[in-house]
Amino acid sequence: MRMMFSPELVNPPFGDPGLIVDFNVERRALLFDLGDIAGLAPRKILRVSDVFVSHTHMDHFVGFDLMLRLCLGRPTSLRLFGPPGFAAQVEHKLAAYTWNLIENEPSSTRIGSTRRASCT
């Protein structure tokens, strides 16, 4: 029986946190926490459709820049999910870059927030 997904730690147990879950039946993956992702092959990073960040301490968010660099200009969306205030933190990181080299590139960035719902 073929597994539908393959979970893999991004780094050794005492390295930056990260778990990638690659869906074997689809061309996509989920990434939980965005620590140091330099050890992942670019082709694997490009499969990521959704990133879930638990909090933005450096060891959980330092991989954002590499993810951004690889995903700029790709035709598919990358969705980021995080704790309250996360959208503003992402917006500040994006604002810190000079974007003059990609003026003619078709790209779209949407930043928004959603609310958490709970059932009791």
PLM ranges: what are they?
Residues 1-120:
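Binuclear metal-dependent hydrolase catalytic cores
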